[in-house]
């Protein structure tokens, strides 16, 4: 039986980041997954992910985001990769809605630079958008996007360079605590380690073993469309990223990159995926109609020429906040799961937190609000 310092189960966005941070600290790391890093069967693919500091979900995330940004920039320098692009983010919606009110709350709490504007002012700056007069818009200049597959590859590169072993074709079937360590069963072998880091993505329900935390996997569609005659390609490429809080759901998208078209997706909604390995990846006509309806309402210069489509998976926690910390019953096990469709931007700092927890049993980073014990404790009045 192979024995290592730390086993990382999962090599998506979080697992490769954890492997990189652990290897940097000198740990002997074995990272295992069914698929190789950068695969398109989980939650870490699809060209881009938003990154923003004025975080409407909760102000407590902002210190982690600041650290994450610095780590992404450091990873760029370490690998010579272009990972984080600051194209700005335009958020629009009702002033009292979760997106605008939450964005402004985080900006005020952490003295973040954002620009408030009326719908007319926003459309004056970016004429491609159509925004109802009653809405408010907030522009965050330093927001932008991460090149998601490149980020995963960069962390895997750093991990390998520092001595970590990353292996695919391992279906991680279970784990057990033995003495002060952990034994992991895969489809190929049994491996032991002093510590286990769980980054299972949509397989969280099978591997995390937290009865108080029911995870739900949602199938989400991503669409790319070419600009039409009313929107020149150069103008489409110069748009900011965008997030619209509409009566028909919360939608987001990106400027046109590499001639592929503009990426648009609905953050809300989605169908439950009972088996992450058996997901319908065909285009759903109802989803396509919804996307094209959103485009007609808010970005009419984008035509109806679909250039690409992909499906990714959200792993939802009960409160839609991350589940990151030591396992409540097994301190040999650190875990990161339930990112609920808004986690990738944090991968760099989540990897650091997981390395701290695995090697030190604690972390100086302010991540206690994400600990799995919050579900068992039923603490009232705390959000999250």
Regions found by a protein language model. Name each.
Residues 1-12, 30:
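Beta1/beta-strand and adjacent pyrophosphate-binding region of the FAD-binding site
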Residues 20-24, 80-84, 190, 195, ...:
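Active-site substrate-recognition segment that forms the wall
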Residues 23-44:
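Glycine-rich FAD pyrophosphate-binding loop
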């Amino acid at each position: 039986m192979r024995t290592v310092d730390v086993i990382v189960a999962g090599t998506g966005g979080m697992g490769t980041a954890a492997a990189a941070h652990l290897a940097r600290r000198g740990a002997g790391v074995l990272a295992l997954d069914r698929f190789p890093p950068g695969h398109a069967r989980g939650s870490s693919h699809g060209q881009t992910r938003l990154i923003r500091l004025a975080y409407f979900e909760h102000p407590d995330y902002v210190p982690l985001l600041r650290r994450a940004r610095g780590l992404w920039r450091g990873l760029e320098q370490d690998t010579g990769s272009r990972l984080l692009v600051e194209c700005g983010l335009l958020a629009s919606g009702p002033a009292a809605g979760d997106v605008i009110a939450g964005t402004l709350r985080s900006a005020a709490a952490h003295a973040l630079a954002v620009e408030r504007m009326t719908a007319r002012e926003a459309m004056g700056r970016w004429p491609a958008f159509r925004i109802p007069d009653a809405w408010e818009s907030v522009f965050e200049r330093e927001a932008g996007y991460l090149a998601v597959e490149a980020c995963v590859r960069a962390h895997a590169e750093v991990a390998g360079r520092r001595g970590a072993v990353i292996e695919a074709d391992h279906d991680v079937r279970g784990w057990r605590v033995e003495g002060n360590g952990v034994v992991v069963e895969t489809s190929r072998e049994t491996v032991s380690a002093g510590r286990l880091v769980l980054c299972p993505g949509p397989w969280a329900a099978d591997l995390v073993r937290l009865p108080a935390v029911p995870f739900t996997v949602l199938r989400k569609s991503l669409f790319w469309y070419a600009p039409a005659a009313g929107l020149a390609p150069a103008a489409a490429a110069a748009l900011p990223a965008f997030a619209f809080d509409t009566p028909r759901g919360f939608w987001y998208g990106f400027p046109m990159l590499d001639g592929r078209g503009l990426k648009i997706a609905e953050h809300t909604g989605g169908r439950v995926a009972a088996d992450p390995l058996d997901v319908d990846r065909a285009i759903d006509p109802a989803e396509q109609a919804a996307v094209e309806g959103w485009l007609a309402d808010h970005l009419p210069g984008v035509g109806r020429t679909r250039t690409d489509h992909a499906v990714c998976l959200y792993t939802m926690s009960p409160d839609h906040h991350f589940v990151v910390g030591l396992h409540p019953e097994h301190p040999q096990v650190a875990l990161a799961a339930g990112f609920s469709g808004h986690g990738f931007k944090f991968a760099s700092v989540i990897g650091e937190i997981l390395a701290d927890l695995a090697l030190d049993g604690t972390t100086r980073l302010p991540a206690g609000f994400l600990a799995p014990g919050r579900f068992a404790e039923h603490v009232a009045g705390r959000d999250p």
